[in-house]
A protein has these predicted regions:
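Catalytic-core regions of glycoside hydrolase
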Residues: 1-97
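C-terminal functional modules
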Residues: 96-199
């Protein structure tokens, strides 16, 4: 393939994966061994078109050392303009969560849910009922009281997240199958409801 491409043609590369946890210099060197073309990183780290009920705004890690090794780095956006401003700010700087929260007027309560919106690669510990309740207590601040254009973008994701937490709480409390089924069928698709009830 490398022999058939005009050497002046710029190659866009996402790393070793379509959504890469990191893009190390070693992987870039392997690509440069195959192609002499200019390379632009097309980074899907913040993209959410493959997981439309989620978004990620955590630190842009595992690829910052590449800026001088390639022609450019493009960030694949979410399509949510205010969210994308955060992603661009994250990729262009080392701002702390606190700085991001202040810059974009995000309520401090978001700190409790941020781990679930940080990265597609973050493994989080299981929650017990106390932990679920602690996160559910942020619902009113983030879904009812907070008013901004950013909140309007995040509202569907936050509501879905809290809905999933309510489901987890019901499962952990061993609610009867009838009660769980009645609750599920009004909130989740039929195939998912049947899968949850089967398990």
């Amino acid at each position: 393939m490398s022999r058939g491409i005009d050497p002046l043609t710029t190659i866009m590369w996402t790393g070793d994966e379509v959504v890469s946890q990191s893009i190390p210099k070693r992987a870039l060197k392997d690509l440069k061994d195959l192609f002499s073309n200019p390379i632009i990183i097309w980074d899907n780290y913040y993209a959410n078109d493959y997981c439309p009920s989620r978004f990620y705004i955590g630190p842009h890690s595992g690829r910052k050392s590449l800026i001088n090794e390639v022609k450019g780095i493009g960030i694949n956006p979410t399509g949510l303009p205010f969210t994308d401003m955060i992603c661009l700010s994250r990729s262009a700087s080392d701002k702390t969560n606190q700085q991001i929260f202040e810059e974009f007027n995000i309520p401090i309560e978001f700190n409790k849910v941020l781990p679930y919106f940080t990265s597609p690669f973050k493994n989080l510990p299981s929650l017990d009922i106390k932990g679920i309740n602690k996160i559910l207590n942020t619902h009113e601040a983030l879904c009812i009281q907070w008013k901004s254009e950013l909140q309007l973008e995040w509202a569907p994701y936050l509501w879905k997240f809290y809905l999933d937490l309510q489901l987890l709480k019901k499962i952990k409390k061993n609610e009867t199958k009838f009660n769980l089924e009645e609750w599920l069928k009004r909130r989740y698709s039929d195939p998912l409801t049947k899968t949850i009830l089967r398990n």
